[in-house]
A protein has these predicted regions:
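General beta-strand recognition
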Residues: 74, 182, 223-225
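A mature extracytoplasmic/lumenal domain signature
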Residues: 58-60, 79-81, 96-98, 161, ...
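Short, cysteine-centered beta-strand-loop-beta hairpins and adjacent loop/turn segments enriched
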Residues: 80-86, 162-168, 231-236
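Hydrophobic membrane-targeting and insertion signals
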Residues: 1-61, 66, 82, 236-237, ...
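Folded interaction domains in cell-surface recognition and envelope-stress signaling
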Residues: 134-217
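A short, surface-exposed beta-strand/turn
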Residues: 90-100, 170-179, 239-252
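N-terminal beta-strand/beta-hairpin edge segment
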Residues: 49-128, 133-139, 154-157
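Extracytoplasmic/luminal low-complexity segments enriched in Pro/Gly and acidic/polar residues
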Residues: 191-252
Length: 252
């Protein structure tokens, strides 16, 4: 009898585990379906050659049907060719999306209210080096300075200047002054380094829907971001890169 009771307990535990796994798999399938649908819709309405990666946060996903809110959605495109910049990484992030149960299940979030909308573009050493004319440029954090963001940040640049046979290093400030991005050397009086590692440009030339509102240095890249609050999602806004006909032109 004791053996039978133990067997029944094991059966009950296995049943609970099976139900849990089945529910988890079903929830994952619904989430993957929504991510796939959003990705395909973004690709169809943008100039992206490849399907972007889409991630929807919140577990379990179907709980959004009851809470009527998707807490996080990210659309990311990696290694996208952009005129003047070369390959860049770009992303669009939506936070606190108010949805109906139907939108949760079918993945169509067009017109859904969003608490925070942000879009960012990241330039790695290759892309920034292309603007500076330095083919082997690398970007890192200055010593004893943690990654930062906002309207100002700092970075350390290393690369071989044209005509040189050895690499040079300089620390730079990253500033947003109105629509303009200003990168200036601050740790040396060497005029050649100051000229080589300095850069100014209008952030409205970036493939963003408006001038950048934040700049940060993180993970070997310099990122520019715009952020808006309390908007209603339009399909064109989900593209990680600004496209013709949405809000402003991409890089000219």
């Amino acid at each position: 009898m004791s053996v039978l009771r133990i067997d029944r307990r094991i059966v009950h535990i296995l049943l609970v585990v099976c139900v849990f796994i089945a529910a988890w798999v079903a929830d994952a399938c619904v989430a993957m379906h929504t991510e796939h649908k959003v990705a395909q819709a973004v690709k169809a309405n943008s100039r992206l050659e490849n399907t972007p990666d889409v991630f929807i946060g919140g577990t379990p996903y179907v709980w959004a049907a009851a809470s009527k809110e998707i807490p996080y959605l990210e659309v990311k495109a990696l290694d996208v060719e952009v005129p003047k910049l070369g390959m860049v990484n770009a992303s669009t992030v939506l936070r606190d999306i108010t949805v109906t149960p139907e939108q949760v299940m079918n993945g169509d979030i067009e017109g859904a209210p969003v608490s925070t909308y942000s879009r960012g573009i990241s330039l790695d050493g290759v892309a920034l080096g292309r603007l500076l004319g330095i083919t082997d440029l690398s970007i890192s954090n200055p010593d004893d300075i943690s990654p930062s963001g906002g309207t100002s940040a700092e970075a350390e640049l290393t690369g071989t200047l044209p005509g040189d046979t050895h690499k040079s290093t300089a620390k730079v400030t990253l500033r947003l002054v109105g629509p303009e991005f200003r990168m200036q050397v601050y740790d040396t009086d060497d005029e050649r380094l100051q000229k080589a590692f300095s850069l100014n440009f209008d952030t409205r030339q970036l493939p963003l829907p408006a001038q950048a509102t934040a700049v940060k240095m993180q993970g070997g890249t310099i990122s520019f971001e715009i952020q808006r609050r309390n908007i209603k999602v339009q399909l064109a806004q989900l593209s990680p890169l600004e496209i013709e006909g949405s809000e402003q032109k991409a890089v000219e």
